[in-house]
């Protein structure tokens, strides 16, 4: 959410940043909505003030035995009492119109974000390792998993339809091992506090992190709990639960940065992904992810962004996976983001000759989410101000599983277990068909 006062004070600067996303200028229309709201507030306040004044004058007129004057004033108060609900409704409508407009406007990119229309405008920042070489043609993870008898899409389709999978035996254990490994590194070495949050959240939580209202069709609505209860949503990412832990609160800046992590299932309708990545586990309605969230001050958010990226990279380095880090351009970055780094891991079984696929996005959101959540902090001067929020995948466990399967595949179709995962595998070093 943006600050309408800042937009009014400098509409040119707002539009200059906003149009870098490839969008048309919008400041004037927002200012007009705000002007309508201000006029409505003024009319309501003037009516209330006049009603209060007239009520006082009635008493004075009666005291002076000026009955004619008192009757005129009582008629005026009665009329104001009749018209004021409409004035108050106009204020409510104008408030809602401005809030709705502001809630559907994306965050502004930072000045150092590269300009571009889509993913082709993203810029490689650096990479780690090199593509593995094979003496055989690498297979896709779904071909390998099905041949092992440990990845069953047909069974999942009977249960839930398309874009689900049933993992069994060694691959089920491998996925669990990856998630546990990620959590252990982030909590034991990177200073994140592990949280086990609810998977069902209310409208306010989804609004706070900006999934609602704009991306309603991409979410899974769980319906109401109990008769007449409020609706719930399945979380698309633990970012929603973790970030909203500070909603409607004022934090002590001595406690910041606050770093939180969670390993959860995530649920996405993928309404805009029809026909894309229909094979395998790349794009699922349900998947597991380790999320990283940081709450910090404006002065520290840039450094915290770099730190979060390094934490996400570290677990992939230890898995021995080749990846590249991309700075997303203005046309490809997320709705709530000021700046995003994507980590793209190399998957040799994807497409013809392999492909890079996103495994993590690390974003700094500034005070965009904090304004929606009313999340603030209080510094040495005692004045509350909005915090800055950051989120990142640390990383997507399902896609990490794909990367391990495809990169560690052997010619006979078995999967070698990376060394760092051996402590979690109960002595299993190679995943092979029974």
UniProtKB/Swiss-Prot annotation:
Q: Where does L-serine bind?
A: 237-239, 291, 393
GO MF, any single term: ATP binding
Question: Its GO biological process terms?
Answer: selenocysteine biosynthetic process; seryl-tRNA aminoacylation
SUPFAM superfamilies (alphabetical): Class II aaRS and biotin synthetases (SSF55681), tRNA-binding arm (SSF46589)
Gene3D superfamilies from the UniProt entry: Bira Bifunctional Protein, Domain 2, Serine-tRNA synthetase, tRNA binding domain
Keywords, alphabetical: Aminoacyl-tRNA synthetase, ATP-binding, Cytoplasm, Ligase, Nucleotide-binding, Protein biosynthesis
Which superkingdom heads the taxonomic lineage of this protein's source?
Bacteria
The record's InterPro entries line, in alphabetical order, gives: aa-tRNA-synt_IIb (IPR002314), aa-tRNA-synth_II (IPR006195), aa-tRNA-synth_II/BPL/LPL (IPR045864), Ser-tRNA-ligase_type_1 (IPR002317), Ser-tRNA-synth_1_N (IPR015866), SerRS_1_N_sf (IPR042103), SerRS_core (IPR033729), tRNA-bd_arm (IPR010978)
Location in the cell reads: Cytoplasm
Could you identify this protein by its name?
Serine--tRNA ligase
User: What is the species of this protein?
Assistant: Rhodopseudomonas palustris (strain BisB5)
Q: Which taxonomic lineage does the organism of this UniProt entry have? A: Bacteria, Pseudomonadati, Pseudomonadota, Alphaproteobacteria, Hyphomicrobiales
